[in-house]
Amino acid sequence: MKFLDLCKVYIRSGGGGGGCVSFRREKFIEFGGPDGGDGGNGGSVWAEAVDGLNTLIDFRYQQHFFAKSGQPGMGSQRTGRSGDDIVLKVPVGTEIIDEDEETVIADLTEVGQRVLLAQGGNGGWGNLRFKSSTNRAPARANPGQPGIDRTIWLRLKLIADAGLLGLPNAGKSTFLSATSNARPKIADYPFTTLVPNLGVVGVDGKEFVIADIPGLIEGASEGRGLGDQFLAHVERCSVLLHLVDGTSSTIVKDYRTIIGELEAYGGDLALKPRITAMNKIDAMDSKQISDRRRALEKATGGKVFTISGVAGTGLMDVLRALWAEIDGARGDKVEEHAPWQP
């Protein structure tokens, strides 16, 4: 399935049906009085987060969603049929943004979460509604309210607990394949990964979701390489795992390149908890591992894990460190949403 994480959609709610002007006509009843029914309500447009989707590709082939209008009222106090609602089914993690591309209308982060995008117009009143003690035979009815035209953007931000960062060929896809159920494409050339991949990782009986995004290069924030468009998919992560290629002769520069791109991207991404791991130690001797780890720890100001995605060395230590951060973040969220108790 092709991956699409941003699309423009045009929606319109249905207009309300017009009210009816009608008078009761029966044998031997000369003045039957008004009996015009109301018009039906127009259909509304909703968005709903559903399980089983991880792309917006369906909206590439259909961008226009117009709800049906309500039917006009009829005589004998019959109300017109209301228009059916339209529901846009989107993946969990979809942001709905106004046409200005800045105002967030809704952020659908849970299965079943719904938001009303365009309310259908109310049906007009029939002349029966206007009957009064002074006007026994009103000959007026209301037209239905018009529908609402709206242009919106859908932006998908995948929901994962941990995000994988690094330069192209840092071994992110190999790490994901070695630690999870994901099977991303792996090859010895840059930008093998072109779209984000998700994998479920198990460690000590616990599970969490990790996201692998295409590699960043220097200047990604300015559009070089694949740009920084995929960084949106790790914005929701509790922790970031920064993989650095240990066989690189510019290991410190490589590390700082990614940090610089995180800072250029903006938001809170550069402030997220981050774990650094030096990868590909299976292709290094002990002195190289020691020297480059020391240089990297000096640059990061913290601990650096040494791992090999190919050989499986050191992976469990990294996964446990990731889980510790994720577990702490989940606990904080539970406390935030806990009801107040005296």
From Swiss-Prot:
Residues 160-327 form the OBG-type G domain. GTP binds at residues 166-173, 191-195, 212-215, 279-282, 308-310. It is found in: Cytoplasm. Its cofactor is Mg(2+). It comes from the Bacteria. GO terms for cellular component: cytoplasm. Keywords: Cytoplasm, GTP-binding, Hydrolase, Magnesium, Metal-binding, Nucleotide-binding. GO terms for biological process: ribosome biogenesis. Mg(2+) binds at residues 173, 193. Its EC number is 3.6.5.-. Monomer. An essential GTPase which binds GTP, GDP and possibly (p)ppGpp with moderate affinity, with high nucleotide exchange rates and a fairly low GTP hydrolysis rate. Plays a role in control of the cell cycle, stress response, ribosome biogenesis and in those bacteria that undergo differentiation, in morphogenesis control. This is GTPase Obg. It comes from Cereibacter sphaeroides (strain KD131 / KCTC 12085) (Rhodobacter sphaeroides). The lineage of its organism: Bacteria, Pseudomonadati, Pseudomonadota, Alphaproteobacteria, Rhodobacterales.
